[in-house]
Amino acid sequence: MSALSGTRLVFGAGGVVSGLSAAQTLDLAQGADELGYDLFSLSDHLHSERPTDDPFTTLSWLAGQTRRIELATNVLALPYRPPPVVAKIAETLDRLSGGRFVLGLGGGGYDAEFHAFGLTERTGGQKIVGQREAITILRGLWSGKPTTLAGQEFSVHGARIDPPAARPIPIWLGAYGPRALALTGELADGWLPSIGRVGLDGARRMRTAVLTAATRAGRDPASIVCATNVIVRLGQQAPPGSGVVSGSVTEVIDQLVDIVAVGFTALLLAVPTVGELETLARDVLPAVRAQAAARTASS
């Protein structure tokens, strides 16, 4: 069973780190694997202020050079690839990695990329419809059965892939707006925002919206993994309002415990070096687990 599907507090690496060489990315993934982190993820952008790699290609490469750590897109810009193509790639990656893949999906938040690369520009409503249709197509194709959907954004007509997915591949949505949060609660296996973008109070309100939508859809809210990206700068002082967790070991522990208290059970820690992952694993994360557990027990 995936370490990410329960209520145990887990930690990941990678995520919003960019500008790394292939060798640095490999070191980071292998270091996270060896240090006991549970997930390594990569973002998805055609263009960025710093160099980035295609996540599917890179995660496939990393799957062959890691042992146990799960691998995720964080998050895949859905409009860049047709859902049937995503379904086939995701099934292959999950199979070749031994069932270690998590598909993080987003509607595509950077409209400038759509315009620059000649992609179809979609309204917010069209992105939500597209995500709903894509999830239906993905899960239908992964079942191995012929799948038909005449959608507004995406359509398939008796399509199937072979082999089918060996398991239900988890789908996490990088959701922020009311409609996206409602869709997450209704259909997704996980919710993946960035805490630095929304803050503690915003994250608390959004999580409530996700869980309320899950209940309304007849789902168990506890079945939804609540994960978040966290940029960490240990030993540094980030500017106020930057959304970066920073400071001394004690200060970083306190800030991470506050994030867990919102209801997050997976913290994806964005640091650029294995040395920083090692310091966090040794000096910070055991204390975060202990203090978070104590806070839960006393509440």
Regions found by a protein language model. Give the residues of each.
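Alpha-helix-loop-beta-strand connector modules within alpha/beta enzyme cores
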Residues: T52-N74, G130-I137, L141, T208-A217, ...
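Hydrophobic faces of well-ordered beta-strands that scaffold small-molecule active sites
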Residues: L9-G15, F40-L42, E70-N74, F101-L105, ...
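Short, acidic/polar
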Residues: L20-A32, V86-I89, L173-E186, V244-I259
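Generic structural signal for well-ordered alpha-helices
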Residues: T25-Q30, F56-S60, A87-E91, R132-R139, ...
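Active-site mouth loops of central-metabolism enzymes
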Residues: F11-A23, L76-P84, A165-Y176, Q236-E251, ...
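N-terminal beta1-alpha1-beta2 module of alpha/beta enzyme domains
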Residues: M1-Q65, I169, A270-V274
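Internal, glycine-rich beta/alpha segment that forms the wall or movable "lid"
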Residues: S2-T7, P82-L187, D201-I224, G235-A238, ...
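A structural motif
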Residues: Y37, G98, A188-D189, F264-T265
